[in-house]
A protein has these predicted regions:
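Flexible, glycine/threonine- and acidic-rich loop/arm segments that mediate assembly and lattice contacts
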Residues: 1-310
């Protein structure tokens, strides 16, 4: 009717803004969560590894003979540089004071968000293919990541070459389809070297590839009769069962076979936050972590590299 006053004419209506902020950004970090945690006390973190002599079938001694003195092998000394990673937040006093939807404090909300981002950065860095950089006054230190350590038991594409000792990144080769034969070969190689792998870490595309393998696998532990399971969560190899773990932040072209007893994260400074100097009407915070990857014996793990990702 004429002169009907409706919402299109109204001026004073409040906006309808939900008081919840929705985010689906993933925050799971399977490698960091599974690795042992240890302490670093210097920017260059060092440790030692050792190995037994090969088993011999000729170990027979003549009765009454003088003992022959065996050679003694020294330990191997390894190292990795600590890397500083940070996230910063600066919020004006006005933004902190105004009434906001979804959070009472902008500063607290942004700090929580940056903390999750920092953890994601650390997972992506450690599971990547980055060579160690010792750093200088003008260049940041960088840790040698997973791809720069695993070399003994790797299966690479054509023209690919192994990394080594954390200070040499692997050279990527020609990408090829992920096959069960390649996976089984690497698992066998790891076992022969003395490893007892418990995890297969893959990206999303090759997690689905692995689920199509026809070998022994566990597709579910329990569930309703009407549920169809098409994924593999546990791979039953000839040398034990391995949990299949998808990782959103590792390189999708890499499939790692891991004995997590031989990987550690050494923290020089654990995740921390501190205030930055106040230079105006704002609050500043820095979140940081300083840590490195400890490869306790890379021969206990393996890698099927250079896989297709689409």
């Amino acid at each position: 009717p004429t002169n009907t006053f409706d919402t299109y004419d109204s001026v004073g209506e409040r906006e309808d803004l939900s008081d919840v902020i929705y985010s689906i950004s993933p925050t799971d970090t399977p490698f960091i969560s599974s690795a042992a945690k240890t302490r670093a006390t210097a920017v260059l973190h060092e440790w030692q590894t050792d190995a037994l002599a090969a088993a011999s079938t000729s170990n027979a001694v003549i009765e009454g003979d003088e003992a022959t003195l065996d050679a003694v092998s020294p330990t191997t000394r390894l190292s990795n540089s600590s890397q500083i990673m940070d996230k910063t937040v600066v919020i004006t006093g006005t933004q902190e004071a105004v009434d906001k939807a979804g959070r009472a404090s902008e500063l607290a909300y942004q700090i929580a968000k940056k903390a999750k981002e920092l953890k994601r950065d650390m997972e992506a860095t450690i599971t990547g293919n980055q060579a160690e950089v010792t750093g200088s006054a003008s260049a940041a230190r960088k840790l040698g990541s997973l791809g720069a350590w695993v070399a003994t038991n790797d299966d690479l594409g054509a023209s690919g070459s192994s990394g080594g000792a954390g200070n040499t990144a692997r050279t990527d080769g020609t990408q090829r389809v992920f096959t069960e034969a390649a996976l089984k070969s690497v698992i066998k190689s790891v076992w022969n070297a003395g490893g007892d792998p418990s995890m297969i870490m893959v990206g999303p595309f090759n997690k689905q590839k692995l689920s199509g393998f026809t070998g022994n696998s566990t597709r579910f532990d329990a569930g309703a009769d009407a549920t169809l399971y098409t994924s593999v969560d546990v791979y039953a190899s000839d040398f034990g069962q391995l949990q299949v773990v998808p990782n959103r932040f590792s390189r999708d072209r890499d499939a790692y076979v891991l004995d997590m007893n031989y990987w550690g994260i050494a923290f020089l400074r654990d995740f921390t936050m501190h205030e930055l100097s106040k230079t105006g009407d704002s609050e500043k915070r820095q979140l940081l972590v300083e840590a490195t990857l400890e490869s306790r014996n890379e021969g206990a793990s393996g890698l099927v590299a250079d896989l297709t990702t689409s």
